Swiss-Prot record:
This is ATP-dependent Clp protease adapter protein ClpS. PANTHER family: ATP-DEPENDENT CLP PROTEASE ADAPTER PROTEIN CLPS, ATP-DEPENDENT CLP PROTEASE ADAPTER PROTEIN CLPS1, CHLOROPLASTIC. Involved in the modulation of the specificity of the ClpAP-mediated ATP-dependent protein degradation. One of its GO terms (biological process) is proteolysis. It comes from Ralstonia pickettii (strain 12J).
Length: 108
């Protein structure tokens, strides 16, 4: 029984192989959104935006009003892992405080 080796191209000793350049692209970004509900106090939403998204009071209030009027509001734009972490932190905090506030992420 003969053992066959996989055929590979033969190169002369003077042959130089060029490395193919890989195009690097930035990571996909995700929007973190808060969804409106009829029970979560507006002040709690403002506090969440300040604590977890580093928004100043004025910006947090504007986002909260967008959530209230339009049904959802963008808290920020993050890479997938950071967005998922923020969604989990906000959701856990809201549940522990007894509020039904929903925080989700979607690809930007």
């Amino acid at each position: 029984m003969a053992i066959r080796q996989a055929t590979t191209p033969q190169h002369d000793a003077g042959t130089v192989l060029e490395r193919k350049e890989q195009a690097l692209k930035p990571p996909a970004m995700y929007k973190v959104l808060l969804l409106n509900d009829d029970y979560t106090p507006m002040e709690f939403v403002v506090m969440i935006l300040q604590q977890y998204f580093s928004k100043d009071r004025e910006t947090a209030t504007q986002i909260m009003l967008t959530v209230h009027r339009e049904g959802k509001g963008v808290c920020g734009l993050y890479t997938r892992d950071i967005a998922a972490t923020k969604v989990e932190l906000v959701s856990t905090h809201a549940r522990q405080a007894g509020h039904p506030l929903q925080c989700v992420m979607e690809e930007a």
